[in-house]
């Protein structure tokens, strides 16, 4: 399509080009509007740029107060951002009516929500990060000093018979953290040679990072932290619905605030977020059933324990048959390939594995075809070690 000068100016503010079949949205494109536009591919023969223009043309036809494309282009040229923001909100509202008929869920995958969650407890942070599709960055216990940070306790805990004891124990752990941190700084400054570092700042930074790495295992889960979270809107809806059903009041309160803030910037796709009733109904009865089993517990572990709990049968054959099937040279289903692999001997199996893996570099993921089966472990460890493992979720 040939665009007018005004259309060109307007489009170039929201897309990287107007003359190619491959283009990106710029940062000026509202996330929800992008999701609606992307979803439009399934219902329209028009290009995304043309559909984008058509939205504003239809709005101006139905609303005489709405700006025309020419007026919007002038707003772009003169950097009149409030006028553009108002037009974008109208466009998102306009498209959300179409989205109701289309169906929401696949559109939510194309929209991303971003949260800043500050001054929450580390216990809450671990539950907030319990999402496979979310991306999280948390205040680092390895690089930042938590000595001056306050502690966060749920009001119900403080009001309980355990409230004073909980606060006292957490305060004692913070005292121990500060003392150990100071001692470890002195220790690592003594054992790390200044000559091995280009600058004094680099030497000091490394010594202190090693000190934090040791002392952080004493931090109680009630210490304050902050984190950022980014996730697709479908996952935002699922995750907040699960958090709203949490038995922990701090989590429910945070989830309500997350929902309120997310609906301010993404009302069209997140208007129906409610507590997950299945989780609300299930958690209590299942916990009660488990408590009533009264099975004998093993002796409490005196040190960390790692035990292999289960492994999928034939997991190596599953991976190799999947890799061979992906070559599209055998014309056999994976089940048939797996049965044939049983009879070819260990050396031939090793050859297949080598062919699939020997070109893998230090930064390459495992082949996708190897994402088969499961390996489960039972771990007994302290909160600090679990916190380190949890941040490497998959």
Where are these regions (language model features)?
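A conserved ligand/cofactor-binding region detector
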Residues: 1-394
């Amino acid at each position: 399509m040939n665009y007018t000068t005004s259309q060109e100016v307007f489009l170039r503010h929201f897309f990287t080009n107007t003359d190619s079949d491959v283009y990106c949205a710029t940062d000026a494109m509202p996330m929800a509007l992008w999701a609606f536009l992307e979803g439009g591919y399934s219902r329209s023969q028009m290009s995304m740029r043309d559909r984008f223009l058509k939205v504003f043309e239809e709005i101006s036809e139905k609303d005489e107060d709405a700006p025309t494309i020419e007026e919007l282009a002038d707003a772009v040229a003169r950097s009149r951002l409030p006028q553009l923001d108002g037009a974008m909100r109208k466009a998102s509202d306009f498209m959300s009516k179409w989205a109701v008929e289309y169906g929401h869920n696949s559109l939510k995958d194309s929209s991303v929500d971003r949260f800043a969650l500050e001054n929450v407890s580390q216990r809450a942070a671990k539950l907030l990060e319990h999402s496979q599709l979310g991306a999280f960055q948390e205040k680092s216990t390895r690089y930042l000093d938590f000595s001056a940070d306050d502690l966060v306790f749920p009001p119900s805990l403080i009001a309980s018979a355990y409230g004073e004891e909980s606060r006292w124990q957490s305060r004692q752990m913070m005292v121990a953290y500060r003392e150990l941190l100071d001692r470890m700084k002195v220790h690592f400054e003594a054992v790390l040679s200044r000559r091995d570092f280009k600058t004094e700042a680099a030497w000091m930074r490394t010594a202190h990072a090693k000190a934090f790495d040791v002392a952080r295992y004493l931090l109680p889960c009630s210490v304050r932290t902050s984190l950022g979270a980014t996730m697709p809107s479908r996952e935002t809806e699922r995750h907040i619905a699960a958090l709203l059903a949490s038995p922990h009041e701090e989590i429910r309160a945070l989830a309500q605030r997350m929902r309120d803030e997310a609906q301010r910037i993404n009302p069209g796709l997140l208007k129906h977020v409610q507590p997950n009733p299945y989780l609300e109904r299930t958690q209590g009865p299942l916990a009660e059933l488990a408590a009533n089993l009264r099975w004998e517990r093993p002796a409490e572990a005196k040190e960390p324990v790692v035990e292999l709990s289960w492994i999928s049968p034939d997991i190596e054959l599953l991976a190799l048959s999947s890799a061979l099937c992906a070559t599209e040279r055998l014309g056999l289903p994976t089940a048939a390939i797996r049965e044939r692999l049983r009879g070819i001997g260990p050396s031939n199996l090793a050859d297949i594995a080598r062919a699939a893996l020997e070109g893998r570099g230090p930064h390459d993921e495992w082949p996708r075809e190897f994402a088969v089966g499961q390996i489960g472990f039972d771990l007994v460890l302290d909160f600090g070690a679990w916190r380190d493992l949890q941040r490497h979720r998959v």
